[in-house]
């Protein structure tokens, strides 16, 4: 339903200053999906390297894949791959839900990382929190579609067995409600994310308290620096997404930006940042 149970230990290990690929590889291998997903990621055309004969050099081992971007970037890579793997697959009649959740999570994570770089907050923790804060949306969405399917199936069987033909026909036309799902996400998602992160019980990736502060909607003046980064990253990502889909006009944009209380230089940095795709070349710059 949520994050892979082996991920917290792996992220904690990667967070150690003395971490090495030889120590990380056995733990990484406990995630059965990681090898194939990591190979697809590092062998993307934008990351491909060529030898002196111009032939593309493919990455084919877990060890090389884990070390491809450096240990310092592994938390970002692993968190992104794990989150993407968790996205809901069956969301008919709303096939774009999976894309929208990923789009939001990535935009928030990248925005948080960039803001963190300006205020002395750990950038890896900021990215990790910015992405995993969206796990509540994943869990709520999966539960909603699963429960809808279960209840509808039971109702169809009941009306068929009792020969209630009109009711049965009406039930076949019922589909999940997008507005109701949005209501459930607005009401429960952040709290679910906070409890999920707390259950992960990570000892070196310190993001649980900040998530609870944001989920409990504490005032900006009373929260930790990481929680403030998350609030600002979420707000800025929301602004950029609304602007992309032309759901906010220029004057609304200016007014909204003024409410964010962003640190000096943040808006300029974020304006120049691509928050739509994870590009490790940006991270390595």
Positions of predicted regions on the chain:
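Conserved alpha-helical "signature site"
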Residues: 1-131, 137-155, 174-254, 275-285
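A structural motif
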Residues: 156-172
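Hydrophobic alpha-helical transmembrane segments of membrane transport and translocation systems
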Residues: 252-254, 263-271
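Short, flexible helical or helix-coil boundary motifs
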Residues: 159, 237-240, 260, 264
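Extended hydrophobic/Leu-rich segments
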Residues: 167-171, 242, 257, 270, ...
């Amino acid at each position: 339903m949520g994050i892979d149970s082996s991920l917290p230990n792996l992220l904690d290990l990667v967070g150690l200053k003395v971490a090495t690929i030889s120590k990380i590889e056995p733990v990484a291998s406990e995630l059965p999906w990681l090898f194939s997903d990591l190979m697809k990621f590092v062998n993307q055309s934008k990351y491909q390297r060529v030898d002196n004969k111009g032939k593309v050099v493919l990455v084919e081992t877990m060890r090389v894949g884990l070390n491809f971007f450096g240990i310092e970037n592994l938390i970002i890579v692993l968190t992104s791959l794990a989150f993407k793997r968790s996205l809901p697959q069956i969301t008919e009649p709303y096939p774009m839900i999976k894309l929208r959740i990923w789009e939001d999570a990535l935009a928030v994570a990248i925005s948080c990382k960039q803001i963190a770089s300006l205020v002395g907050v750990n950038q890896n923790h900021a990215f990790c929190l910015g992405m995993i804060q969206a796990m509540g949306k994943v869990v709520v969405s999966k539960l909603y579609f699963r429960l809808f399917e279960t209840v509808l199936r039971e109702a169809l069987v009941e009306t068929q067995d009792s020969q209630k033909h009109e009711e049965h026909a009406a039930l076949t036309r019922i589909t999940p409600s997008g507005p109701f799902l949005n209501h459930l996400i607005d009401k429960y998602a952040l709290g679910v994310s906070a409890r999920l992160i707390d259950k992960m019980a990570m000892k070196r990736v310190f993001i649980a308290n900040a998530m609870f502060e944001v989920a409990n909607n504490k005032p900006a003046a009373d929260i930790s620096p990481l929680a403030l980064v998350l609030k600002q990253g979420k707000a800025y990502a929301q602004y950029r997404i609304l602007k992309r889909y032309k759901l906010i006009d220029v004057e609304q944009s200016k007014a909204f930006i003024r409410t964010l209380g962003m640190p000096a230089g943040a808006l300029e940095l974020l304006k120049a940042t691509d928050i739509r795709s994870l590009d490790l070349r940006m991270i390595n710059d």
